[in-house]
Amino acid sequence: MKKILASLILSAITQVAVAQVPEGKKVISSLYIHDLASGKSNLILREIRHFEAPNWSPDGKYLLINSLGRLEKISTMGDKLGELNTGNVKDANNDHGYSFDGKTLFISSAKPEIKEHTSFIYKVAAEGGEPTQITPASTSYWHGVSPDGKDIVYCANRNDNYDVYKMSVNGGEEIRLTSTEGLDDGPEYSPDGKYIYINSYRTGTMQIWRMHADGSQPEQMTFDAHPNWFAHIAPNNKVATIITYI
């Protein structure tokens, strides 16, 4: 069994009173970089606004966060480097990230012209530009891309149930990988491409699972009493970081 370490945080956002802030109270978002060797966390940005979902840039020089539907670049020292150009896609949510080769950015975003809540998946050049829509159906939330860059995996609501699906980065057939009742979410490929890690509520508590890349042979990886979400596998394929709610 692959070892899962819940205490490791590569980058994190802590937020105070994010949802439905009462009148007179403020939303405070904080961005940290945590050094795994020293165990020290460095606060690089704290502001009175809602921002979230930091992702390392392919060259490691900045972090990409989202705020109010836009994607912003923040240097590792906390300097604001401006918005990333995402063309007409201007209502991004917190599900975005880069391909393994660093050439492509995947974005999940609503369409303002559709009144009900939506989320579609797009791809765009890592340096920005006009995105191309991948998934035709909503709601679809991007979470991972295969190491060879050919397929994306994502969480999608189909027939009032959230499961994990796979599709070519160029669009096409939607392949269902999970079919359990309740939420299956957060799919991410292992660096060797053999496994997809997910978090699933199939046991009654959100836990980390992994399955073969074709969705077969699901295997539970965490067994504690706490809800565990979003496994991110280290490049060495030996450890993972997860979010645990205690």
Where are these regions (language model features)?
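Beta-propeller blade-edge and WD-like acidic-aromatic loop motif
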Residues: E23-N42, Y62, N66-T86, D101-T104, ...
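Residues at the start of alpha-helices and the adjacent loop-to-helix junctions
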Residues: I4-S11, R46, N88, Y141, ...
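Conserved beta-propeller blade repeats
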Residues: I48-L64, K90-L105, A137-C155, E181-N199, ...
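Hydrophobic alpha-helical segments
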Residues: V16-A17, R49, E113
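Bacterial Sec-dependent N-terminal signal peptides
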Residues: M1-V21
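Asp/Glu-centered strand-loop micro-motifs enriched in Gly/Pro and often flanked by an aromatic residue
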Residues: N42-I48
